[in-house]
């Protein structure tokens, strides 16, 4: 785990999600010190935001791809 104040821009969605899941497990166990738990929580928020951003980017790409030949756009609600 790196500094809780920053998040590497090149971290993949899968890596971020895996790390976020690990943080949740650690916090749920309640075996970390308060300071460590707060730092983990802070990192978790950064990871959550990163995952949401990646999902939004993917959704926008998919919407762009669904353009029809006549340049109309078909936007279908996607479940994420």
From Swiss-Prot:
Subcellular location: Cytoplasm
UniProt GO cellular component terms: cytosol; exodeoxyribonuclease VII complex
InterPro entries, per database record: Exonuc_VII_S (IPR003761), Exonuc_VII_ssu_sf (IPR037004)
Chief location category: cytoplasm
Swiss-Prot/TrEMBL GO biological process terms: DNA catabolic process
Reactions catalysed: Exonucleolytic cleavage in either 5'- to 3'- or 3'- to 5'-direction to yield nucleoside 5'-phosphates
Organism domain of life: Bacteria
Protein name: Exodeoxyribonuclease 7 small subunit
Native organism taxonomy: Bacteria, Pseudomonadati, Pseudomonadota, Alphaproteobacteria, Rickettsiales
């Amino acid at each position: 785990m790196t500094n809780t104040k920053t998040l590497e821009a090149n971290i993949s969605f899968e890596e971020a999600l895996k790390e976020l899941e690990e943080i949740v497990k650690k916090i749920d166990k309640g075996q970390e010190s308060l300071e460590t738990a707060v730092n983990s929580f802070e990192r978790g928020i950064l990871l959550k935001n990163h995952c949401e951003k990646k999902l939004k980017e993917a959704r926008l790409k998919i919407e762009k791809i669904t353009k029809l030949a006549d340049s109309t756009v078909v936007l279908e609600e996607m479940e994420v």
